[in-house]
Amino acid sequence: MQVRQSIHSDHARQLDTAGLRREFLIEHIFDADACTMTYSHIDRIIVGGVMPVHQAVTVGEDVGKQLGVSYFLERRELGAINIGGAGVVSVDGERYAIGHEEAIYIGKGARDIRFTSVDPAKPARFYYNSAPAHTTFPTRKITAAEASPQTIGDDATSNRRTINKYIVPDVLPTCQLTMGLTKLAEGNLWNTMPCHTHERRMEVYFYFDMDEETAVFHMMGQPQETRHILVHNEQAVISPSWSIHSGVGTKRYTFIWGMVGENQVFSDMDHVKVSELR
């Protein structure tokens, strides 16, 4: 498990390219028949990927000492979205069939969590976020239809995109975790511009659905001290609450957003005008 410490905005603005990437970019998410984990001190979120190919993959079997618990979800909840082939998630013996672009929420207290693929030639690829939890809510599958797809933006500003809200209060209860998937329309390049911050929550963006020659310039930093990180396929960026989080790609792309913090109000944003950015 990799560990990323919190960082003050005054420190972040002094970093060079290598420093920004070291602190905020998660370059590697998926390994065959393995579970990856990056633990951020910012709101204690854990980010990673599970890609079962030839065998079932369990989550968090060896992190008890690092988290100070006897099992992974003893004091945590978890959300996962499948961006690969059909998969199955077993939670304490109960099986959930999770197809492409379907999701699962697993509540606090689940002990035995196993991920498998239906077809090893087309393995499932589960991207997950986990956050501290104070109580238990039921484990549940979320379909793409339940995510209530909403298309916003337009071609003139190159930001027409469809937002899918999988793990939000309107769909199911969680302690603090929210997750969703945003898909840009063909020929559109910008996400979240005009941009915003939200002092009450942190966020992680996971970029995917990109070919080898496609890249996203992820914008970050305080509105008057912006920086960028160049992101490639299946990489994630940690966004502290003081940072904007926006991006422009060389071609269209898709990304998963996950938030934890004080509240779960999707519209609770501190908007920043483009004219105010520096």
Curated annotation (Swiss-Prot):
CDD domains: cupin_KduI_C (cd20491), cupin_KduI_N (cd20294)
Keyword Zinc recorded: yes
InterPro entries: KduI (IPR007045), KduI/IolB_isomerase (IPR021120), KduI_N (IPR027449), RmlC-like_jellyroll (IPR014710), RmlC_Cupin_sf (IPR011051)
Catalytic activity: 5-dehydro-4-deoxy-D-glucuronate = 3-deoxy-D-glycero-2,5-hexodiulosonate
One Gene Ontology molecular-function label: 4-deoxy-L-threo-5-hexosulose-uronate ketol-isomerase activity
Induction cue: Induced by galacturonate and at a higher level by polygalacturonate. Is expressed under the control of KdgR, but is not controlled by PecS. Is repressed by glucose.
Record-level GO BP terms: D-galacturonate catabolic process; D-glucuronate catabolic process; pectin catabolic process
Taxonomy, superkingdom: Bacteria
Entry EC no(s): 5.3.1.17
The protein's annotated pathway: Glycan metabolism; pectin degradation; 2-dehydro-3-deoxy-D-gluconate from pectin: step 4/5
Keyword Metal-binding belongs to the record: yes
Disruption phenotype: Cells lacking this gene are unable to grow on polygalacturonate (PGA) or digalacturonate, but can grow on galacturonate.
Cofactor comment: Binds 1 zinc ion per subunit.
Disulfide bonds, paired cysteine numbers: none
UniProt keywords, alphabetically: Isomerase, Metal-binding, Zinc
Record-listed Zn(2+) binding positions: 196, 198, 203, 245
Gene3D superfamilies xref list: Jelly Rolls, pectin degrading enzyme 5-keto 4- deoxyuronate isomerase, domain 1
Entry cofactors: Zn(2+)
Function, in words: Catalyzes the isomerization of 5-dehydro-4-deoxy-D-glucuronate to 3-deoxy-D-glycero-2,5-hexodiulosonate.
NCBIfam families linked to this entry: PRK00924.1
The family this protein is said to belong to: Belongs to the KduI family.
Name of the protein described by the UniProt record: 4-deoxy-L-threo-5-hexosulose-uronate ketol-isomerase
